[in-house]
Amino acid sequence: SSYGDYTPTFFFETAKLFGKDGELALDAMLLQVSTPDEHGYCSYGLSCDYTKSATENAKIVIAQINKFVPRTLGNCFVHIDDIDYIIEEDTPIPEVQPPVVGEIERKIGEFCASLVRDGDTLQLGIGAIPVAVLNFLKDKKDLGIHSEMISDGIVDLINLGVITNKKKNLNPNKAIATFLMGSKKLYDYANDNPAIELHPVDYVNNPIIIAQNDNMVSIN
């Protein structure tokens, strides 16, 4: 028979678990990265979260370099010299289409959006209700993003000039997240785009960091 460990933890603490002296320190890390730039740096692409910590502290790092992985910016790079084994394989990235918004979700979204003020910084979760909320924010001004996740709907509001990130205390003029989840439209938009930055989860989801933004609004 086999055994597994169950380790309850907050998401922002997972980076520590994969750290050098963490309970989940790895013998080997297998990951997918972007093609390296002229300086040899590969981006973690869609997900920085605990990936950076796990990669930096694993005994062996095995990376698939994939030209379809977006080169996201922020604190989410690994140098090619720090990769032990490289596999070159170009595979399109799986897409996650937005959920269907029904009438109930639409009503909830409309109500929640009415509570958002100009200049607020938003955290948005996964599911139909956050998508519905985004649909009702088109009349707002200078919203900011400091969120675990960035989705297609956030890109739409950036393009409309609703999300500017100008009013944020922390990381102004940048939409901050720890991973991307959406369609090719999102991945293409985030590619080498300084308006979006991915950072490790122990930064993005840390309550002490989040609290440095005034008028923080969480919608899940």
Region locations from a protein language model:
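Conserved alpha/beta enzyme-core scaffold
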Residues: 1-220
